Regions:
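Active-site catalytic microenvironments for nucleophilic, acid-base chemistry
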Residues: 127-131, 180-187
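Conserved non-catalytic scaffold segment of RNase H-like nuclease domains
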Residues: 3-129, 133, 138, 156, ...
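Acidic, divalent-metal-coordinating active-site segment for phosphoryl/phosphodiester hydrolysis
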Residues: 169-182
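Conserved beta-strand -> loop -> alpha-helix junction used to position metal-binding or nucleic-acid-contacting
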Residues: 134-152
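Phosphate-binding/catalytic loops
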Residues: 149-171
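Short, conserved alpha-helical segments within structured domains
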Residues: 116-120, 143, 170-173
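Short intrinsically disordered terminal tails
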Residues: 1-2, 187
Length: 187
């Protein structure tokens, strides 16, 4: 799988130049209609099924916020989200039912940003394949941007992952990631 890193590393850039490139990217990402920030919750880290997805714009407009029926029982041992019950997820739409909405909010040339874009990308593509659906432009790794990588670059530690504080929902994750993006752009 392609590694989703932004800005791309340049060996001939100093740490200060790399930081400023990251600040410029964050400022562009916060322009109206430039970026949709995606937040996801899964049943397990890395390989879990999608159970919640949200998407917001830089002005905090909520474009998507829904639970997702994983169509499989949640293993109580790996349950990460005690506030979500089987009954809540059973009545939620499936990924196949929300894919069109996700495609719509991320279309028209916008960048797709997620805190951990590599994980978000893998989850969205994996869910699309499991549903037998075409992820269209979501399958292009060049459209995705990692706010975590931008944060690491900005802090001068491009090889270190700084996690977000725990959040209660995919929407909360979007807002936390947006806050990081705003911090970077304010530099």
């Amino acid at each position: 799988m392609t590694t989703l890193v932004y800005p791309p590393p340049h060996e001939n850039m100093t740490a200060g130049e790399h930081r400023q490139a990251t600040v410029r990217w964050a400022r562009r990402a916060l322009r109206p209609d430039a970026t949709v920030i995606i937040g996801l919750e899964t049943t397990a880290p890395g390989s879990g099924s999608l159970i919640e997805i949200a998407g917001i714009e830089a002005d905090r407009t909520i474009r998507l916020n829904t639970l997702v029926n994983p169509k499989t029982p949640i293993n109580p041992v790996t349950r990460r989200h005690p506030h979500l019950t089987e009954d809540m997820l059973t009545g939620a739409p499936t990924f196949g039912q929300i894919l069109t909405e996700l495609l719509t909010i991320t279309d028209d040339g916008r960048s797709i940003a997620a805190y951990n874009s590599g994980s978000a990308f893998a989850t969205v593509i994996g869910e699309s394949r499991r549903a037998g659906l075409d992820p269209e432009h979501l399958e292009d790794p060049a459209a995705w941007r990692s706010i975590a990588q931008a944060r690491s670059n900005w802090l001068g530690h491009p090889d270190h992952y700084f996690p977000l504080p725990p959040t209660a929902s995919a929407l909360d994750q979007c807002h936390a990631a947006l806050s990081v993006l705003r911090d970077i752009s304010a530099d």
